[in-house]
Amino acid sequence: MHSSGSSFAKAGHEPGPPLWLLAELTYRCPLQCPYCSNPLDFAKQGAELSTAEWIEVFRQARELGAAQLGFSGGEPLVRQDLAELIAAARGLGYYTNLITSGIGLTEARIAEFADAGLDHIQISFQAADEEVNNLLAGSKKAFAQKLAMARAVKAHGYPMVLNFVTHRHNIDNIERIIELCLELEADFVELATCQFYGWAELNRAGLLPTRAQLERAERITNQWRDKLAAENHPCKLIFVTPDYYEERPKACMNGWGNLFLDITPDGTALPCHSARQLPVQFPNVREHSVEHIWRHSFGFNRFRGDDWMPEPCRSCDEKHKDFGGCRCQAFMLTGDASNADPVCSKSAHHEVILAARRQADEAPLGLGELQYRNDKASRIICKA
């Protein structure tokens, strides 16, 4: 890792520190969720960073001011050096969290991670129904393993943090999802409707809930919030909606290259999880220092500030609130990452969003029609 290379830093747009570092340790995963955010072509990605290379990334990012480090994937548990990486991150002063499906987790590994200094474990579920969960995961044993490991995480003194990715095929069971979380003594529950990137975008026609489904689910969630608050119950419910039913875009990542730094398994550095699909050459930690990447690389400066914005964003009085929306969504839905996010009603491409809403109401795909995330499918997509 070195610092050589041209500087594309923009005067007046000096970034702060990359406070949140995400280490996507691997794209390997025993599950095949059809809403995975990993790139469609994950099967052709390069060799994973070694233990030593990851630790050097952690060190350099910490020097820049990174404070929180997430271990993600794929499934990070397939990395046999995970405890060593956790210990190194802890020694550098990071707050660390493990984002996992729970597949591959054991009580022994939980204890090992605790000894290494891991602060937080989040376990994801596909559904509260065993059959649907296992179908979406592609494993007949997934649901039972998740239940066992959720209980084990709690027993080892960790806060119980659960994530349910919701979509049109499970969101109507939101009440049962919440009940299951309470049975597991969850402290925090993220009820996160699919965000349509990667495999989720490929399967959007089969995953996007209708507006009526979302409104019902949010209403039930709010009723449970009121009930839990009245009982002084510690469980917190977080409801995340897709922006497909909004008229203004989200402030994606709180601005491009502003707070978030993602390092992919092969060392490519990204300003968000999905940016790899853009027609932008992003830097790699094997070739450049993290400091150079964050401050000077073309990829991280491409959409900083607002000088890149065309109309209607350039003259919009909301541009410093939403930063023009999501660059990846603009690229996926309009073919040009510089365009206004089509979620915005001011966008010339807003009809794409309206059409997706109509499709959710009129012609959705069934569970059996989804393209599941696996190595074979990725290789076929790579050849297409």
Curated annotation (Swiss-Prot):
The record lists the catalysed reaction(s) as: [PQQ precursor protein] + S-adenosyl-L-methionine = E-Y cross-linked-[PQQ precursor protein] + 5'-deoxyadenosine + L-methionine + H(+)
Q: Describe how the cofactor binds.
A: Binds 1 [4Fe-4S] cluster. The cluster is coordinated with 3 cysteines and an exchangeable S-adenosyl-L-methionine.
EC number from the UniProt entry: 1.21.98.4
The yes or no answer to whether the keyword Oxidoreductase is present is yes
Q: Give the pathway annotation.
A: Cofactor biosynthesis; pyrroloquinoline quinone biosynthesis
Cofactor(s) the protein needs:
[4Fe-4S] cluster
Record function comment: Catalyzes the cross-linking of a glutamate residue and a tyrosine residue in the PqqA protein as part of the biosynthesis of pyrroloquinoline quinone (PQQ).
Task: Spell out the subunit comment.
Answer: Interacts with PqqD. The interaction is necessary for activity of PqqE.
Instruction: Give the protein name, as stated in the record.
Output: PqqA peptide cyclase
- Source organism (scientific name): Ectopseudomonas mendocina (strain ymp) (Pseudomonas mendocina)
Q: Which gene encodes it?
A: pqqE
